[in-house]
Amino acid sequence: MEFPFDVDALFPERITVLDQHLRPPARRPGTTTPARVDLQQQIMTIVDELGKASAKAQHLPAPITSALRMQSNRHVIYVLKDTSARPAGKGAIIGFLKVGYKKLFVLDDREAHNEVEPLCILDFYIHESVQRHGHGRELFQYMLQKERVEPHQLAIDRPSPKLLKFLNKHYNLETTVPQVNNFVIFEGFFAHQHRSPTPSLRATRHSRAAVVDPIPAAPARKLPPKRAEGDIKPYSSSDREFLKVAVEPPWPLNRAPRRATPPAHPPPRSSSLGNSPDRGPLRPFVPEQELLRSLRLCPPHPTARLLLATDPGGSPAQRRRTRETPWGLVAQSCHYSRHGGFNTSFLGTGNQERKQGEQEAEDRSASEDQVLLQDGSGEEPTHTVAPRAQAPPAQSWMVGGDILNARVIRNLQERRNTRPW
């Protein structure tokens, strides 16, 4: 396989080993190249062209070897160049062999799963024009010596029929162990699995990895111990007791203290509920005297109102409680003043009963005036009514008035059965 640049100057040896960095090998003394030539770009071009030729020979839809894949994996390519002929003095590439370590789960002859990390043959290609000339065996044998591995210890990734014939012809690898993946292993693969890998192979691999990528391994992080999980039980009836909201009795019975005896052993709480506070009484504790006072001053029950509504007369206490404030109770309010009149707006809206009382008071005062005049003069009483101008109006009385007004108020209050003083 020919290239437009000088392959002989790029690869001084017949077999060149390339790692993931695709760097050109050390140059022989006396070899000169122009400074502008990008050697790494030439190596990437060679790898890409070899991958395309291998995919075409194996009838693969896409190449499995490329410069980009090489840079993202720790694989190794053994490149074989032709030193016999130098067309135009630039050299040519015969083929390549790509290998790498992979962690696999394979089955042994007893169909038991085994976790291994063998060296795998990932891609192998020799140009069609130089096949059957021993170039393939030369390249394969160089790889075995370099990696210090035996042919039966290898795992081959999707080998072609030509590769299987090649291994059978040169290394007597014929009997395979069936696997569930795309890798093929031969009989004798597990003969040395009970022993650790060859120290030289492992040391070579790790030393190569350290030189290629000298990055220290990250220290293992210790995870905290996992706490034991208890049984998660659903809510029981006892767990839900404290969540129940008590129904309050009708007023004023709800003002009475509810003395509930606390349980000796409270029900266990579920861990998912957290530390919820206990529900206290709905109302604070009310003393007995305050309870009796509230019962005495509380409004009547709707049932009692219904009974009083059906009774046309009702009880006297209820009538006194529900009817309007009489005149005599004005002295109990803040409207009373011994130096002036009281607020007449409180008496502005009278009813028929008030008018009736005023008329009776006027008649009685008139009769008393006649008795007093008869007692003072010794004459026969005359049924003459005092002029209205001499008697002050009933609604404009004052405590400092005459004796007649005081008597009228006294008689009126006795009739009302209430006393303001």
Curated annotation (Swiss-Prot):
<keyword id="KW-0168">Coated pit</keyword>
<keyword id="KW-0597">Phosphoprotein</keyword>
<dbReference type="GO" id="GO:0005925">
    <property type="term" value="C:focal adhesion"/>
</dbReference>
<dbReference type="GO" id="GO:1900227">
    <property type="term" value="P:positive regulation of NLRP3 inflammasome complex assembly"/>
</dbReference>
<dbReference type="GO" id="GO:0030424">
    <property type="term" value="C:axon"/>
</dbReference>
<comment type="function">
    <text>Specifically acetylates 'Lys-40' in alpha-tubulin on the lumenal side of microtubules. Promotes microtubule destabilization and accelerates microtubule dynamics; this activity may be independent of acetylation activity. Acetylates alpha-tubulin with a slow enzymatic rate, due to a catalytic site that is not optimized for acetyl transfer. Enters the microtubule through each end and diffuses quickly throughout the lumen of microtubules.</text>
</comment>
<keyword id="KW-0963">Cytoplasm</keyword>
<dbReference type="GO" id="GO:0097427">
    <property type="term" value="C:microtubule bundle"/>
</dbReference>
<keyword id="KW-0808">Transferase</keyword>
<feature type="region of interest" description="Disordered">
    <location>
        <begin position="214"/>
        <end position="235"/>
    </location>
</feature>
<feature type="modified residue" description="N6-acetyllysine; by autocatalysis">
    <location>
        <position position="244"/>
    </location>
</feature>
<feature type="binding site">
    <location>
        <begin position="124"/>
        <end position="137"/>
    </location>
    <ligand>
        <name>acetyl-CoA</name>
    </ligand>
</feature>
<keyword id="KW-0966">Cell projection</keyword>
<dbReference type="GO" id="GO:0048265">
    <property type="term" value="P:response to pain"/>
</dbReference>
<feature type="region of interest" description="Disordered">
    <location>
        <begin position="252"/>
        <end position="284"/>
    </location>
</feature>
<dbReference type="GO" id="GO:0000226">
    <property type="term" value="P:microtubule cytoskeleton organization"/>
</dbReference>
<feature type="compositionally biased region" description="Basic and acidic residues">
    <location>
        <begin position="226"/>
        <end position="235"/>
    </location>
</feature>
<dbReference type="GO" id="GO:0009612">
    <property type="term" value="P:response to mechanical stimulus"/>
</dbReference>
<comment type="subunit">
    <text>Component of the BBSome complex. Interacts with AP2 alpha-adaptins, including AP2A2, but not with AP1 gamma-adaptin (AP1G1/AP1G2); this interaction is required for efficient alpha-tubulin acetylation, hence clathrin-coated pits are sites of microtubule acetylation.</text>
</comment>
<dbReference type="Pfam" id="PF05301">
    <property type="entry name" value="Acetyltransf_16"/>
</dbReference>
<dbReference type="GO" id="GO:0019799">
    <property type="term" value="F:tubulin N-acetyltransferase activity"/>
</dbReference>
<dbReference type="GO" id="GO:0016407">
    <property type="term" value="F:acetyltransferase activity"/>
</dbReference>
<feature type="modified residue" description="N6-acetyllysine; by autocatalysis">
    <location>
        <position position="146"/>
    </location>
</feature>
<keyword id="KW-0965">Cell junction</keyword>
<feature type="modified residue" description="Asymmetric dimethylarginine">
    <location>
        <position position="305"/>
    </location>
</feature>
<feature type="modified residue" description="Phosphoserine">
    <location>
        <position position="276"/>
    </location>
</feature>
<dbReference type="GO" id="GO:0007283">
    <property type="term" value="P:spermatogenesis"/>
</dbReference>
<feature type="compositionally biased region" description="Polar residues">
    <location>
        <begin position="342"/>
        <end position="351"/>
    </location>
</feature>
<dbReference type="GO" id="GO:0045598">
    <property type="term" value="P:regulation of fat cell differentiation"/>
</dbReference>
<feature type="modified residue" description="Phosphoserine">
    <location>
        <position position="272"/>
    </location>
</feature>
<feature type="modified residue" description="Phosphoserine">
    <location>
        <position position="315"/>
    </location>
</feature>
<dbReference type="InterPro" id="IPR038746">
    <property type="entry name" value="Atat"/>
</dbReference>
<dbReference type="GO" id="GO:0005737">
    <property type="term" value="C:cytoplasm"/>
</dbReference>
<feature type="modified residue" description="Omega-N-methylarginine">
    <location>
        <position position="323"/>
    </location>
</feature>
<feature type="site" description="Crucial for catalytic activity">
    <location>
        <position position="58"/>
    </location>
</feature>
<dbReference type="GO" id="GO:0016020">
    <property type="term" value="C:membrane"/>
</dbReference>
<dbReference type="GO" id="GO:0048666">
    <property type="term" value="P:neuron development"/>
</dbReference>
<dbReference type="GO" id="GO:0021542">
    <property type="term" value="P:dentate gyrus development"/>
</dbReference>
<feature type="binding site">
    <location>
        <begin position="160"/>
        <end position="169"/>
    </location>
    <ligand>
        <name>acetyl-CoA</name>
    </ligand>
</feature>
<dbReference type="InterPro" id="IPR007965">
    <property type="entry name" value="GNAT_ATAT"/>
</dbReference>
<dbReference type="GO" id="GO:0044546">
    <property type="term" value="P:NLRP3 inflammasome complex assembly"/>
</dbReference>
<keyword id="KW-0012">Acyltransferase</keyword>
